[in-house]
A protein has these predicted regions:
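Bacterial N-terminal signal peptides
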Residues: 8-18
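C-terminal partner/receptor-binding element of secreted or periplasmic proteins
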Residues: 24-47, 114-153
Length: 153
């Protein structure tokens, strides 16, 4: 049975577009470096966790995943990260997404209407210090407000 894309929930539709076929699935999310952040959202190890973590904000997350941004990068040979920003700038509308390939954990920051809308993990939990520099490039003020700690092994 075929389903029109308009019938799918927004985040599910975005993830379906981003997901490569099983034959194309990279063995590691690190192989996605150089692609837009939307590719990370469609990776098998990330998509389910992202869907669950975004909860009631799935539409907002789906919209932000489509925003333009620099190619994804890799930090410490285990984190792949990227972001997308509204043409007005990341301080207005944007999304930062990172994935720790060693612990299979996502890090997500969503900005809506100039304010942070979603933090995964929560704002009070420490983020890996390896992500401090990429976060400063995405949104310096939010990076300054976060707490960073050494990445767990």
């Amino acid at each position: 049975m075929w389903c029109r894309p308009a019938v799918l929930p927004p985040l599910a539709a975005v993830l379906a577009l981003a997901a490569p076929s099983a034959a194309q699935e990279p063995t590691s999310a690190l192989a996605l470096a150089g692609q837009p952040v939307l590719a990370l959202a469609g990776h098998a190890a990330v998509s389910g966790v992202l869907r669950q973590a975004s909860g009631g904000r799935r539409r907002i997350v789906a919209e932000r995943l489509r925003l333009p941004g620099p190619p994804m990068g890799v930090a410490a040979d285990r984190f792949v990260y990227g972001w997308g920003c509204d043409p007005r700038g990341c301080r207005e509308e944007g999304l930062f997404l990172a994935f720790d390939t060693a612990r299979e954990r996502i890090y997500l920051l969503v900005v809506e209407d100039g304010a942070p809308n979603l933090f995964v993990p929560p704002r009070t939990a420490p983020w890996p210090e390896t992500l401090a520099e990429p976060l400063r490039a995405f949104h310096p003020a939010l990076a300054a407000a976060l707490r960073f700690a050494p990445a767990e092994p």
